[in-house]
């Protein structure tokens, strides 16, 4: 394949000397310092570095010499591009993209790759470029383009050294897209490949087992997991994850008998998983769920506490704790736990529903309504109709609560609206600890925080007293073994706001600290009800409203009437309106990751419901190759601010919405990036005018959904990562005039992408920095001004160069810059060197020694044959009414009308593909009796007739004979008979229909033909067409031109219809085929 760079005669020239030549004669640059230069040794070392080293190069070894060298090379390239005003060799940008990719600066790598793509016409010959571009798209979850780039690599270079990595990523992406057959194929290809890979064979086998689980082939998944456990020298972390998956599968799936039997299998698996990895917060959470389902509330609480201590705060865990408290008649403690859950994830529908149920049980309908409204607003809530009915009931009957006395309580949002956030509480503690060393400004801030803290305390005590006096029927709050008020004396509840906040590690709301200090439950605990699986097709209802011993409301039929249990409130994920890939997205995020975190796991039944909005797409698979401390752990991404559907989402299949098993070992994308980043996790402080650009990869975790799933984006990979004015301002530090503040690192922001005329611009938020506007980069009339920018520029403005556009950049005189010489690889065969008529001996000789794994080491493609690709979809897309236009119908009254030239022109006009002509037989005075069965038998009874049998199917579908898959070719079984035999069949079948006492009806009762009907069978037979009309009544016929059948390989119809009439017309009448469909 073509190398990433080209060898120039000026390669030996130092970068410093070249820069001096370019700067000669430019007085404005006399005062500037000389740019960095690369030595010969450094250029030789860089010559071996391209995208193929991604995941294998260790940047922090040897004193981080490799990372320093790559950073120096990037700065040199950026400086020279600025001086050359962007008019450099296209391979220069390819090398720059490789270096930025190895440094894991994905935004800059994408910009450089896009520039190379737009400048190099035969970019498809460069396999290293396609591989690097695919890695960047994979990082940004642009699976549509990543799949295309990786497939192009395998097409142009089947023996590519990183083919195993490509198969691995293709398997993950196809699993996300629910193409399980393709996913399994690529996982198996990766498994049998002996080349080095960032993932071990055991980890690939884990992905295959999880793929079965995602397909709900639980027995196959169980066998695959158990077979993996028998592997010798299985890494401890892989073993822990497999055991975790097996335990959670037994808990949720009906693999064995009743509940007690399932838990008897699930709990030992989870305990063994914790033996292999005691720090797995996810396994502790699953164990708590299992204990809770069988009534071991004390053990469940201990497991939940262990989960919180070993991982970041999880909304799922706190919601489950709230259910336990609510089950124990401790509404205040349950309230605090639910508030922790909704604070960590404001869109946690199950927590809002449980909180609404709690308020409803305490006769606070207005607060319950507000909680139900919040649950209904959540994008992960599927039972909105049930919630709407409940809200309507509460609104209509709220005045009748408590004997007609309506209660006026502050809603939960108001109770804690004055509370400090966990971050401010931590800051307050720090200021108090350093009170003696504070400056005047800090002392003033401390006074303000303490005054606000006092107001919060007063508000909290007032609200708690109100709930105690009016909110509980029986007066007594709970078992004396647990305090009724779990709020710390020093710290109030964390505030509940519309903007969800993420609790930082080590910083917990006050209710969290107090709830953890409550200890175990009393011995007389009531077991909690078993929660439904999220994948269940049953309607999932709200919990009991009889928690405190109150009488259940008979007017609420869908509420459970069990006064002893309070099942978890779940949302049903099997919504018919939800796309399958969105349901399965979190399950395909399995990647075994090297870090000190807990295992991920979960059943594919519990999958988070992802937003269907145009600007959200969850990062399903980790794109970086991550390594930490040289051993495997399965991380628990416990910040549930993404798309966790319910309080169970963190344990969804294969880690649920909160985790992803990273499939890579060697590389580390970012210290701050979680394994499965949530869509709003890293949006940053809105008050900051300039974000850390080097951490941009941690911010871009959203995609416009159409950019991933829609096939209507053409074949251009030009993601507009840098052409958004707001995002560009963020990258170059111009936001709020903070360019020269030093808060941003230097970034070479190249803009090769193009804008379209439609409104597909990049989202203004840095978390949605990928656009769908990607026409062909060769359309120079649609290009925006390309610029090369530097964040460390002494000027506050943008360095806009090459303002004339890319079209002029290639035609202009280019500065001869010294490129790093890359070792050449196999090249595309020139078309002139290939003979089109080789002998068999030459062919056999060429096929000998095909190379490794049966694949040739040299490419057999011609230099003018790019990889195949489907044609671009028409733009703009046609509306539905245009896809199925109304069919014109014309009625003929006489022969003159039939031969009217405008009628012929109308019928042959491409704008009218189908035309129905009525009254043709009468206008032409055709004697259809001449074509009756009797007449044909008398004329030529031995004439061979072809009979075809076709399947009944909708007009817009075409299935194969087995009915298992859609095909393009119209299948039709062919057989032959004679007119005499067909007449005999027709007569006998007609007699059978008469004996069956068939009742004739009007033509309006026509029914579609059943499967296996014969094209020439009698229309009046119930076992064929089932067209019910008197056989003696002639019918009207639809006239179809011959081309209407030939485009699917069908001959026009030529034989009998009902009543002995032949559905064919005279060729002299200008009709080539007549349909026997009665009208």
From Swiss-Prot:
Q: Name one GO molecular function term.
A: histone H3K27me2/H3K27me3 demethylase activity
Q: Where is this region: Disordered?
A: 558-694, 757-813
- For the keyword Cytoplasm, the answer is no
Residue ranges annotated as transmembrane are none
Q: Which cysteines are joined by disulfide bonds?
A: none
Q: Where is the composition biased (Polar residues)?
A: 558-601, 609-626, 647-656, 782-795
| Catalytic reaction list | N(6),N(6),N(6)-trimethyl-L-lysyl(27)-[histone H3] + 2 2-oxoglutarate + 2 O2 = N(6)-methyl-L-lysyl(27)-[histone H3] + 2 formaldehyde + 2 succinate + 2 CO2
Q: What is its main location?
A: nucleus
Keywords assigned? Chromatin regulator, Dioxygenase, Iron, Metal-binding, Nucleus, Oxidoreductase, Phosphoprotein, Repeat, TPR repeat
Compartments annotated for it: namely: Nucleus
Q: Does the keyword Iron apply?
A: yes
Q: Which GO terms describe its biological process?
A: heart development; regulation of gene expression
Query: If you read the UniProt record, what top EC class would you report for this enzyme, in one word?
Result: oxidoreductase
| Oligomeric form and interacting partners | Interacts with TLE1 and TLE2.
Function, please? Male-specific histone demethylase that catalyzes trimethylated 'Lys-27' (H3K27me3) demethylation in histone H3. Has relatively low lysine demethylase activity.
Please give the name of this protein: Histone demethylase UTY
Organism of derivation: Pan troglodytes
């Amino acid at each position: 394949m073509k190398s990433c760079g080209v060898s120039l005669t000026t390669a030996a020239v130092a970068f410093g000397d070249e820069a001096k030549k370019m700067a000669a004669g430019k007085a404005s640059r006399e005062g500037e310092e000389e740019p960095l230069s690369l030595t010969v040794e450094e250029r030789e070392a860089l010559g071996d570095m391209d995208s193929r080293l991604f995941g294998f190069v260790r940047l922090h070894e040897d004193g981080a010499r490799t990372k320093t060298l790559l950073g120096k090379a990037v700065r040199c390239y950026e400086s020279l591009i600025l001086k050359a005003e962007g008019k450099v060799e296209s391979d220069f940008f390819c090398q720059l993209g490789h270096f930025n990719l190895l440094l894991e600066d994905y935004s800059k790598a994408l910009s450089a790759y896009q520039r190379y793509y737009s400048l190099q016409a035969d970019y498809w010959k460069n396999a290293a470029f396609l591989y690097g571009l695919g890695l960047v798209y994979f990082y940004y979850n642009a699976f549509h383009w990543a799949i295309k780039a990786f497939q192009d690599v395998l097409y142009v270079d089947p023996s590519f050294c990183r083919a195993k990595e490509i198969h691995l990523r293709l398997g993950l992406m196809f699993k996300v897209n629910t193409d399980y057959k393709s996913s399994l194929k690529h996982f198996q290809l990766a498994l049998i490949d002996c080349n080095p890979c960032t993932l071990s064979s055991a980890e690939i086998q884990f992905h295959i087992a999880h793929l079965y689980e995602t397909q709900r082939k639980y027995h196959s998944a169980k066998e695959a997991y158990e077979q993996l456990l028998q592997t010798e020298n299985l890494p401890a972390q892989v073993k822990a994850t497999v055991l975790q998956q097996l335990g959670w599968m037994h808990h949720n799936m009906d693999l064995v008998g009743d509940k007690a039997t399932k838990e008897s299998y699930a709990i030992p698996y989870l305990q063994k998983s914790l033996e292999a990895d005691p720090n797995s917060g996810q396994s502790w959470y699953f164990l708590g769920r299992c204990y809770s389902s069988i009534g071991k509330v004390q053990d469940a609480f201990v497991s939940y506490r262990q989960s919180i201590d070993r991982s970041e705060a999880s909304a799922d865990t706190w919601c489950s704790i709230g259910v336990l408290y609510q089950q124990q008649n401790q509404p205040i403690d349950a309230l605090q736990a639910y508030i922790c859950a909704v604070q960590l994830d404001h869109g946690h529908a199950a927590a809002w529903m449980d909180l609404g149920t709690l308020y409803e049980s305490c006769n606070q309908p207005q607060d319950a309504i507000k909680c139900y409204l919040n649950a209904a607003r959540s994008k992960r809530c599927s039972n909105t109709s049930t919630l709407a009915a409940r809200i309507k009931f509460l609104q209509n009957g709220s005045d009748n609560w408590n004997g007609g006395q309506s209660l006026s309580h502050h809603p939960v949002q108001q109770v804690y609206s004055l509370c400090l956030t966990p971050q401010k509480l931590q800051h307050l503690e720090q200021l108090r600890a350093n009170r003696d060393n504070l400056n005047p400004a800090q002392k003033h801030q401390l006074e303000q925080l303490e005054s606000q803290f006092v107001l919060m305390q007063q508000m909290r005590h007032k609200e708690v007293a109100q709930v105690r006096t009016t909110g509980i029927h029986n007066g007594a709050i709970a078992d004396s073994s647990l305090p009724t008020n779990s709020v710390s004396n020093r710290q109030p509840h964390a505030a509940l706001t519309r903007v969800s906040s993420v609790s930082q590690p080590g910083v917990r709301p006050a209710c969290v600290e107090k709830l953890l200090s409550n200890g175990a439950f009393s011995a007389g605990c009531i077991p909690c009800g078993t929660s439904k699986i999220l994948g269940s097709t049953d309607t999932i209802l709200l919990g009991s409203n009889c928690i405190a011993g109150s009488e259940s409301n008979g007017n609420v039929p869908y509420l459970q009437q069990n006064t002893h249990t309070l099942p978890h409130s779940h949302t049903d994920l099997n919504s018919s309106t939800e796309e399958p890939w969105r349901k399965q997205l979190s399950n395909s995020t399995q990647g075994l990751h090297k870090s000190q975190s807990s295992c991920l796991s979960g059943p594919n039944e519990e999958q988070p419901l992802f937003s269907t909005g145009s600007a959200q797409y969850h990062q399903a698979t980790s794109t970086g190759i991550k390594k930490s401390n040289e051993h495997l752990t399965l991380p628990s991404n416990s910040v549930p601010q993404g798309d966790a559907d319910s309080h169970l989402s963190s344990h969804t299949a294969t880690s649920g919405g909160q985790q992803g098993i990273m499939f890579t070992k060697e590389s580390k994308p970012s210290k701050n990036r979680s394994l499965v980043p949530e869509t709003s996790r890293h949006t940053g402080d809105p008050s900051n005018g300039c974000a850390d650009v080097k951490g941009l990869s941690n911010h871009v975790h959203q995609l416009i959904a159409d950019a991933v799933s829609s096939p209507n984006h053409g074949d251009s990979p030009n993601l507009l990562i840098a052409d958004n004015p707001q995002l560009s301002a963020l990258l170059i530090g111009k936001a709020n005039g903070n360019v020269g503040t030093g808060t941003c690192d230097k970034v070479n922001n190249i803009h090769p992408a193009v804008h379209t005329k439609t409104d597909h611009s990049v989202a203004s938020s840095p978390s949605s920095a990928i656009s769908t506007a990607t026409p062909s980069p060769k359309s120079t009339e649609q290009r925006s001004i390309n610029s090369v920018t530097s964040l460390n520029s002494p000027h506050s403005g943008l360095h806009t160069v090459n303002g004339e556009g890319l079209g002029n950049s290639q035609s202009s005189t280019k500065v001869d810059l010294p490129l790093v010489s890359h070792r050449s690889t196999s090249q595309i065969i020139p078309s002139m060197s290939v003979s089109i008529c080789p002998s068999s001996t030459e062919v056999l000789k060429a096929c000998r020694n095909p190379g490794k794994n049966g694949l040739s080491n040299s490419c057999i493609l011609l230099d003018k044959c790019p990889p195949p690709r489907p044609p671009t979809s028409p733009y703009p897309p046609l509306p539905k009414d245009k896809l199925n236009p109304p069919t014109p119908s014309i009625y003929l009254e006489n022969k003159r009308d039939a031969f009217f030239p405008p009628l012929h022109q109308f019928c042959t006009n491409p704008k009218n593909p189908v035309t129905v002509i009525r009254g043709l037989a009468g206008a032409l005075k055709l004697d259809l009796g001449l074509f009756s069965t009797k007449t044909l038998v008398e004329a030529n009874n031995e004439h061979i007739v072809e009979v075809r049998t076709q399947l009944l199917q909708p007009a817009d579908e075409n299935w194969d004979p087995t009915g298992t898959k859609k095909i393009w070719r119209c299948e039709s079984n062919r057989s032959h008979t004679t007119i005499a035999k067909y007449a005999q069949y027709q007569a006998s079948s007609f007699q059978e229909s008469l004996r069956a006492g068939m009742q004739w009806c009007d033509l309006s009762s026509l029914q579609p033909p059943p499967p296996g009907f014969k094209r020439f069978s009698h229309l009046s037979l119930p076992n064929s067409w089932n067209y019910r009309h008197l056989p003696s009544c002639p019918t009207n016929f639809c006239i179809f031109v011959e081309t209407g059948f030939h485009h699917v390989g069908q001959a026009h119809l030529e034989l009998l219809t009902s009543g002995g009439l032949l559905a064919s017309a005279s060729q002299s009448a200008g009709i080539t085929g007549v349909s026997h469909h009665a009208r």
